[in-house]
């Protein structure tokens, strides 16, 4: 399996970023990229320890994030999530059970911040019609997340 090497690469990439003079790293668990593909039930059809249950689907994201934290410290690691994203065939019909679990586990790591893509924005900056009436990440996730929360995506004067 390639997964242990992928997890190790997150730690090495974090070390490389610090060595190159960056202040920290953001783990990209959004927009249909690898970590989100494992996380979301629409894209993850695995039947091993990385598929099926919420805990299993979250495993790769949590392992990769822990590898970065172990490499450079939690205060230098943030993570970006898109609970309502649909990029690359990812997504959840009801994302809150999954993200309640993921955010609870991420809280334990003491990360620098959590960066959310708003439900009303897609990866292409267009409105996600399916989620246009879902409250802001500030309303849905703030009660779950203990640290710094950043939200982005399709803000307008009436929603900012």
Specify the residue positions occupied by each region the protein language model found:
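Flavin-dependent oxidoreductase catalytic cores
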Residues: 1-160
């Amino acid at each position: 399996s390639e997964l242990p090497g992928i997890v190790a690469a997150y730690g090495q990439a974090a070390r490389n970023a610090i060595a190159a003079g960056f202040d920290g790293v953001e783990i990209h668990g959004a927009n249909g990229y690898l970590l989100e593909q494992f996380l979301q039930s629409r894209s993850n059809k695995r039947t091993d320890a990385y598929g099926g249950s919420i805990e299993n689907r979250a495993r790769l994201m949590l392992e990769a994030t822990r590898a970065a934290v172990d490499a450079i410290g939690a205060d230098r690691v943030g993570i970006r999530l898109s609970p309502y994203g649909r990029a690359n065939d990812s997504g959840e019909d009801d994302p809150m059970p999954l993200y309640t679990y993921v955010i609870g586990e991420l809280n334990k790591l003491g990360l620098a911040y959590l960066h959310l893509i708003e439900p009303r924005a897609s990866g292409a900056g267009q409105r996600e019609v399916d989620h246009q009436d879902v409250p802001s990440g500030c309303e849905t996730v703030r009660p779950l997340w203990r640290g710094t929360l950043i939200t982005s995506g399709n803000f307008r004067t009436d929603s900012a």
